[in-house]
Structures are given as C-alpha cells and as structure tokens.
A protein has these predicted regions:
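P-loop NTP-binding/switch modules centered on Walker-like glycine-rich loops
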Residues: 182, 186-263
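Conserved ABC ATPase signature
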Residues: 148-152, 156
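Helix-to-loop junction immediately C-terminal to a conserved catalytic motif
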Residues: 61
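ABC ATPase NBD coupling module
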Residues: 20-24, 78-92, 118, 238-243, ...
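Short catalytic/signature loops enriched in Gly
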Residues: 3, 17-21, 235-315
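A short, proline-enriched helix->beta-strand linker immediately N-terminal to the Walker B motif
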Residues: 167-171
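Conserved ABC ATPase "signature" region
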Residues: 125-143, 252-253
Length: 315
C-alpha cells in the first residue's frame, strides 16, 4: 500500500544557548518516531503537554527542520522544510488558536484566495469559484467572504481555518488541537464538520490532542507519545479499551474504567522528566509503578504485539 506520508526514525532537537561562557543545551523534542498514514484514515496522536506531538506535526509539515531521519510523501523521500512546494498539495494544517492563525484585518476571501494566487493554474475567476466551493463545504455562505476575520466568532474562524486547509485539495490535514480553544458546543460542530468532510472527500487527518476521549472518538488508529517517543500505537478503540503500556493505562485511568476487568493503571503522579536530560532507560521509568532494573538502564524498542506496537520491557 502507498501511504500518504511516512516517517522513519524522525528526530527533532532544539539547541538552547546556555549564555555567555556556558554550554549549550539540547531539547530532545521528537525521538526516533516511525509512523505512517493510509489514505482516508484518521491517525490520532495523544499525550501530555510537552510530549512532542505538535512538534512532530510541525516537522512533518515543514515548519520545523528535522534533525535526522526520513520523511516520505506518496512514497517519495522529501525534506518538507526545504521543498515546501512538494508538501502543500499533499498536506495542510489547521492550527489550535483560530484567533491567532488568521490575519484579523484581511477579508475571508483574501485569506482563502492567497494560496491559490501562488498556483498559476488558477485564474482570477477560478479563484472566486474555488473560494465559493470551500465556503459551501464548511457550511458558510458567500456573504462571509466579504467579512474581516476579526468580525467572526471562534467557531466561524476555525471553520475558515479548515476551509483554508481545504482550498488546495490536500490528501491530508494536520489538525493541531483544533477544538481546544473553543466552547464545548462549538467543539461538537467542528468535529461533526471534520467527519463529514472526510466522508465526502476521503481526506486523511493527523489529529493531535491531549484529550484521549476525543482522539479515541475520531481516530481509526491512535498513537500515545511520551517525552518525544511513541509508547504505544494501534487501533483506536481497542487501544483505548484495552491499554497495555503502563503510560497508556495511566492516561485511561483519568477517564475511569471503560470495560469491566480491562487493564486500567494508577493515575499519573509527578511531572515528566526534563527533555533537556531524558532518562537513559525507558523514558517512562521514573513515573512507572512497574519499573525495575532493566527499565532504568536500557530503552525498550517499539515492538509488534498483536495488532499494535508497544515500547515496554514488561510486554
């Protein structure tokens, strides 16, 4: 099968200056992540704040340059940071904050036409037609095109953000916490819109969120990240109802038991380690109630287990 995108051992590090006469420090934001996405699939990535899930999405999109590893789109290896023209027909992004992601002084028409102006195949008339199409797809009429972004509500702004992502007809849309800044009632509307668009157009979503319930609801497959690495990956509902990795079980414990006798772990305690100095062994060893000997000195690989992959010495 040809995947929409695939990463092989992707690493993203940030170097921080230590100041005058002080050594530099390295933030290990993404640590050797190998993932893929099939056409029409929703892949959810979940984890605590600072786990690297958004950084992974930004690196995949080309907004950060990968430190090492490989990125493939439709089977072709590319560097999204350098070759952004190769990325945009394949992948677009919906950002977390609809108030910050749109220029408040531009009209909706101008915001949506801007990407089309960079493509010579679109004439001015074609651009008008395409803008009308995407507004209709997100449930807004043409009158919204004449309004400035600052005149819109949060839900309307995020709908425009989705329309902007749709305008170039990408295969995949990265949704980075797309509903976390919205009221609950608006969250439902946006989720319903995303599902409808996927049914109509076969779009793939990379859905990034800290909300395990939301990721489970919308995703076909789910990835659990911790301190920049994948802890567990598998079918979303199966992984949610029968978590295996101690970290995944701890996350599900926050939502209460789902199925009687399902393996639910103790709630998380303490804070994640400093990404400037990650543990030498398993990244979760310092907070894991099952950690012992080997866990503290040797990092477990991500191994196949039934229909999922898990990085844990106890499985």
């Amino acid at each position: 099968m040809s995947y929409v995108w695939e990463t092989d051992n992707l690493v993203k590090e940030f170097t921080l200056s230590g100041g005058l006469f002080k050594p530099k420090h390295t933030v290990h934001a993404v640590q050797g992540v190998s993932l893929y996405q099939s056409p029409g699939e929703t892949l959810g990535i979940v984890g605590e704040s600072g786990c690297g899930k958004s950084t992974f999405g930004y690196t995949l999109m080309g907004l950060h340059q990968a430190t090492s590893g490989s990125i493939y789109m439709n089977g072709r290896q590319i560097d999204p940071y350098v070759d952004r023209k190769a990325v945009h027909p394949v992948m677009q992004m919906v950002f977390q904050n609809p108030y910050a992601s749109l220029n408040p002084r531009l009209t909706v028409n101008a915001i949506l036409e801007e990407p089309l102006e960079l493509d010579p195949k679109y004439t001015p008339r074609d651009r008008v037609i395409r803008v009308k199409e995407v507004l209709d797809q997100v449930g807004l009429n043409m009158s919204f095109g004449e309004r400035d972004a600052h005149e819109l509500s949060g839900g309307q702004r995020q709908s425009i953000g989705i329309a902007r992502a749709l305008i170039m007809q990408p295969q995949c849309i990265i949704c980075d916490e797309p509903i976390s800044a919205l009221d609950v009632s608006i969250q439902v509307q946006i989720m319903t819109l995303l599902e409808r668009l996927q049914e109509q157009h076969g779009i793939s979503y990379l859905f990034i969120s800290h909300d395990l319930n939301m990721v489970r609801y919308i995703s076909h497959r789910m990835v659990v990240m911790y301190l920049g690495a994948v802890m567990e990956e598998g079918p979303a509902l199966d992984l949610y109802e029968f978590p295996q990795h101690p970290y995944t079980r701890a996350l599900t414990a926050l939502n209460g038991p789902v199925i009687p006798h399902a393996p639910i772990g103790a709630p998380l305690k303490g804070d994640p380690p400093n990404p400037l100095d990650p543990p030498k062994g398993c990244l979760f060893s310092g907070r894991c109630p099952e950690a012992e000997g080997r866990c503290f000195v040797e990092r477990p690989p991500l191994r196949d287990w039934a229909d999922r992959r898990i990085a844990c010495w106890h499985i």
